[in-house]
Design a protein with these regions (language model features):
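Conserved acidic
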Residues: 22, 53, 137
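Intrinsically disordered, low-complexity regions enriched in Pro/Ser/Thr/Gly and acidic residues
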Residues: 95-183
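Edge beta-strands of extracellular beta-sandwich domains
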Residues: 201-205
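Acidic surface patches and DE-rich sequence motifs
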Residues: 75, 154, 194
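Short, exposed beta-strand-loop hairpins at the edges of beta-sheets
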Residues: 189-195
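Extracellular Ig-like/FN3 beta-sandwich strand-entry sites
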Residues: 185-187
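N-terminal single-pass transmembrane signal-anchor helix
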Residues: 2, 7-34
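Extracytoplasmic beta-strand-rich oligomerization domains located immediately C-terminal to a leader/signal peptide
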Residues: 29-131
Length: 208
């Protein structure tokens, strides 16, 4: 019995080319889909990291601002500075500075906040009354900041762009010529224009 010659016929060159083309197309589609998934995952992780960075920054600012204390300090020139000075930047004296190592230092700390080169930066000094060689520790808290605004709520619930209205101490006749510190604001409002998250408005209540 003679075998059918058609039963042993292999693929033609054209069929092989078509199969290779289909395989290449499927491989390209699979690779493109995988690349898209990986790219989306990377964007998601970056967004999560930026959000965690903002949350950490909020907690740091809350800890600093809500623990402000009415303690003046002296700058590197020996001039007395108010417990809280606010405008486009913010400087304050805060309490509750943890000391787990038990070092011989105060639990009070001088803190500053400023907007510099699309970053919100925190400054901290290791001493309250500084010498001329006292340098602060500079800590960038977040990037991609387009603007930072500060406002201060006074005792009459009116918002002020600066605090206090004057940097001079208030002369109180009842204290027989002694100078009285201006009151601290009731709250500090921080507005941040962020490149990725838009406008963020945070309100911190100060101890009264």
């Amino acid at each position: 019995m003679r075998a059918d010659p058609c039963a042993c016929r292999g693929f033609t060159l054209l069929e092989l080319l078509v199969a290779l083309a289909i395989f290449g197309l499927l491989a390209a589609m699979s690779y493109g889909g995988l690349w898209t998934v990986l790219e989306q995952q990377s964007h998601t992780e970056q967004a999560a990291d930026r959000l965690a960075e903002l949350q950490k920054m909020y907690l740091i600012m809350q800890r600093d601002i809500e623990q402000v204390v009415p303690r003046t300090v002296r700058d590197e020139f020996g001039d007395e500075q108010l417990p809280l000075i606010g405008g486009d930047t913010l400087r304050l004296t805060r309490g509750g500075w943890r000391n787990p190592a038990g070092r011989q230092r105060s639990t009070l700390q001088r803190i500053g906040y400023a907007y510099e080169e699309q970053q919100l930066v925190r400054y901290s000094w290791s001493v309250l009354d500084r010498a001329q060689d006292s340098e602060p520790l500079k800590l960038p808290l977040t990037e991609d900041v387009e603007r930072m605004g500060l406002r201060y709520l006074d005792g009459n619930d009116a918002w002020k762009e600066r605090w206090p209205d004057t940097t001079d101490f208030v002369d109180n006749e009842a204290t027989e010529g002694l100078l009285e510190l201006p009151a601290l604001p009731k709250a500090v409002e921080v507005t941040i224009e962020h490149k990725n998250f838009g406008t963020l408005v945070w309100l911190f209540q100060l101890p009264q």
